[in-house]
């Protein structure tokens, strides 16, 4: 369903298109802005698109890159060479925004959202309501945000001769985090191992992501443009999507502030402590040999449930936890050949873990669902409901 888009948005996007056309950009896929009920602001096409067609082609001149900032005559002498690519791009955006109308990228900056609703801005009391696996991931992100602020603030003060406010920093950080593209595999102008592997691309970031479309993207050294090619058909007057890659909803929620219903990549992670707790509850003894085997074979990675059930790592770990000493001596057979035959102990431990995870999710869900004043609360509720359905499916099967 298409809703009416804000007139100011339309004006700003028209101004952006006009400016980009003066720099040899063309709207090759006949895209136009719309507001969609399901995905918010996005782009639809005025013509049907076939697989293999280019969606966007952004000239190199219009890309904002950390490398351009570092090597500019204006700022190269003052930019800290130790800044990460991400932080340098955040600083570049803040410096350009501070220039206002005189910025080369002024038309682009006007199209960027003025505010972001992100989980890192949740009140502390709501963060405490979240399941542990979400809260831990969120805490890591908040720490990363704070570290980035310290790095960027020093450079901003040197360049703009004023202090950087945390709210202004967060705006730029979220712009880069949610909109920057990674540019690799080109003719050497961009290098994933260098300080110039990310870019902000005007117009491109108006396209929304979905898991059920296919697209390829990258910098084309022959056209000197960043290009996205669709591998899916799009009917006339329909929203045009791109695919960021296979992200689970936890990553999408923490990094970008949204989730995708029925995401096939969705994953509810488990911690090793979940397994130890279940073993303690059912008096399953963990010998030193068992723990050494788990560490030796790196069996604590990728623990959790997908939409179709527990991960391979969970099945193997449960088998190892249920083994006696003699069985552990033939561990290779257990890990690579025999793990599909589940014993009673394995099923008991798994059900214990699933029951506790289900209870944790239900408690969080019932509490957060009562908060009607937080914009991102609805996203959290949807995310928790998806996680709960995954756990319930695994429990039933």
From Swiss-Prot:
UniProt keyword list: Chromatin regulator, Methyltransferase, Nucleus, S-adenosyl-L-methionine, Transferase
Chemical reaction(s) catalysed: L-lysyl(79)-[histone H3] + 3 S-adenosyl-L-methionine = N(6),N(6),N(6)-trimethyl-L-lysyl(79)-[histone H3] + 3 S-adenosyl-L-homocysteine + 3 H(+); L-lysyl(20)-[histone H4] + S-adenosyl-L-methionine = N(6)-methyl-L-lysyl(20)-[histone H4] + S-adenosyl-L-homocysteine + H(+); N(6)-methyl-L-lysyl(20)-[histone H4] + S-adenosyl-L-methionine = N(6),N(6)-dimethyl-L-lysyl(20)-[histone H4] + S-adenosyl-L-homocysteine + H(+); N(6),N(6)-dimethyl-L-lysyl(20)-[histone H4] + S-adenosyl-L-methionine = N(6),N(6),N(6)-trimethyl-L-lysyl(20)-[histone H4] + S-adenosyl-L-homocysteine + H(+)
Coiled-coil positions: none
Signal peptide: none
Annotated S-adenosyl-L-methionine binding sites: 244
EC number(s) recorded for this UniProt protein: 2.1.1.-, 2.1.1.360
Cell compartments where the protein resides: Nucleus
GO cellular component, one term: nucleus
GO terms of molecular function: histone H3K79 trimethyltransferase activity; histone H4K20 monomethyltransferase activity; histone H4K20 trimethyltransferase activity; histone H4K20me methyltransferase activity
InterPro entries per record: SET_dom, SET_dom_sf, SETD3_SETD6_MTase, SETD4_SET
Chain's role: Protein-lysine N-methyltransferase involved in the regulation of cell quiescence by catalyzing the trimethylation of 'Lys-20' of histone H4 and 'Lys-79' of histone H3 (H4K20me3 and H3K79me3, respectively) during diapause formation, a state of obligate dormancy.
Name of the molecule in the record: SET domain-containing protein 4
Species assigned in the record: Artemia parthenogenetica (Brine shrimp)
């Amino acid at each position: 369903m298409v809703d009416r888009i804000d007139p100011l948005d339309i004006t700003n996007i028209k101004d952006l298109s006009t400016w980009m056309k003066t720099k040899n950009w063309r709207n090759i896929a006949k895209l136009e802005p719309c507001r969609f009920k399901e995905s918010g602001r996005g782009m639809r096409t005025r013509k049907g698109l076939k697989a293999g067609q280019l969606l966007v082609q952004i000239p190199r001149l219009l890309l904002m890159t950390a490398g351009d900032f570092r090597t500019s005559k204006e700022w190269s002498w003052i930019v800290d060479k130790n800044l990460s690519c991400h932080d340098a791009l955040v600083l570049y955006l803040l410096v350009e925004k501070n220039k206002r109308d005189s910025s080369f990228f002024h038309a682009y900056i006007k199209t960027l959202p003025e505010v972001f609703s992100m989980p890192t801005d949740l009140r502390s009391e709501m963060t405490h309501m979240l399941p542990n696996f979400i809260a831990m991931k969120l805490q890591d992100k908040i720490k990363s945000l704070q570290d980035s602020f310290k790095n960027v603030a020093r450079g901003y003060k040197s360049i703009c001769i004023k202090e950087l406010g945390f709210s202004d920093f967060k705006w730029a950080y979220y712009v880069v985090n949610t909109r920057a593209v990674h540019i690799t595999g080109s003719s050497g102008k961009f290098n994933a191992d260098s300080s110039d592997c990310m870019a902000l691309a005007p117009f491109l970031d108006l396209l929304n992501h979905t898991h059920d479309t296919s697209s390829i993207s990258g910098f084309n050294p022959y056209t000197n443009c960043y290009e996205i090619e669709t591998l899916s058909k799009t009917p006339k007057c329909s929203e045009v999507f791109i695919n960021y890659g296979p992200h689970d909803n936890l990553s999408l929620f923490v990094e970008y502030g949204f989730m995708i219903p029925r995401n096939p990549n969705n994953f509810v992670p488990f911690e090793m402590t979940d397994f130890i707790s279940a073993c303690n509850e059912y008096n399953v003894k963990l010998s030193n040999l068992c723990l050494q085997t788990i560490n030796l074979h790196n069996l604590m990675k990728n623990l959790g449930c997908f939409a179709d059930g527990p991960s391979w790592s969970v099945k193997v770990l449960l088998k190892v936890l249920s083994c006696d000493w003699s069985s552990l001596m033939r561990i290779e057979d257990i890990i690579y050949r025999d793990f599909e035959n589940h014993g009673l102990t394995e099923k008991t431990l798994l059900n214990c873990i699933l029951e506790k995870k289900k209870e944790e999710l239900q408690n969080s869900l019932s509490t957060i669902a009562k908060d009607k004043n937080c914009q991102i609360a609805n996203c959290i509720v949807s995310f928790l409901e998806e996680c709960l359905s995954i756990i319930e499916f695994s429990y039933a099967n």
